[in-house]
Design a protein with these regions (language model features):
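Long, low-complexity, charged/polar intrinsically disordered regions in eukaryotic proteins
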Residues: 1-55
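Basic, alpha-helical nucleic-acid-binding regions used in initiation and control of genome expression
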Residues: 3-6, 25, 87, 93, ...
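Short acidic, hydrophobic short linear motifs in intrinsically disordered regions
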Residues: 46-53, 57-82
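Short amphipathic alpha-helical interaction segments
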Residues: 79-97
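Conserved hydrophobic residue
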Residues: 98-102
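Short, cationic-aromatic polyanion-contact patches
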Residues: 105-116
Length: 116
């Protein structure tokens, strides 16, 4: 993956409120980009375009955390423990496939995935 191609022809897809920041999702040629609204710099995370469809198919109607996504999706190529799973949930939320719940599971954010 080349950095120049990541930023070519980006389209704004949506945004979602995290606990502390607003996250913006952009669609590029091959990837989705997640960027937090930060005052000190610019940070971008790359999410595979296949992720929203996998979340919709495997978790429709369920409440999930990033950890649950990594453990239960059976797709280590797309979801790993840590921030990649959380970024995947931010993408799902920004695209309207999920919503972030106020309720938490321990310290983890919980997302409700829309039904089929």
């Amino acid at each position: 993956m080349k950095v120049a191609s990541l930023f070519k022809d980006l389209s704004f897809m949506g945004q979602i409120e995290g606990d502390r920041r607003t996250y913006y999702v952009f669609k590029g040629m091959d990837y989705l980009l997640v960027s937090a609204n930060g005052r000190d710099g610019f940070n971008v995370n790359v999410v595979d375009q296949e992720v929203p469809e996998v979340i919709k198919k495997k978790f429709a109607g369920k409440r999930v955390t990033g950890r649950m996504l990594a453990d239960q999706a059976r797709r280590p190529d797309l979801f790993s423990p840590g921030f990649s799973s959380l970024n995947a949930l931010y993408v799902a939320g920004a695209l309207g496939l999920a919503r972030k719940l106020v309720k938490k599971q321990g310290r983890a954010m919980v997302f409700k995935i829309k039904g089929k």
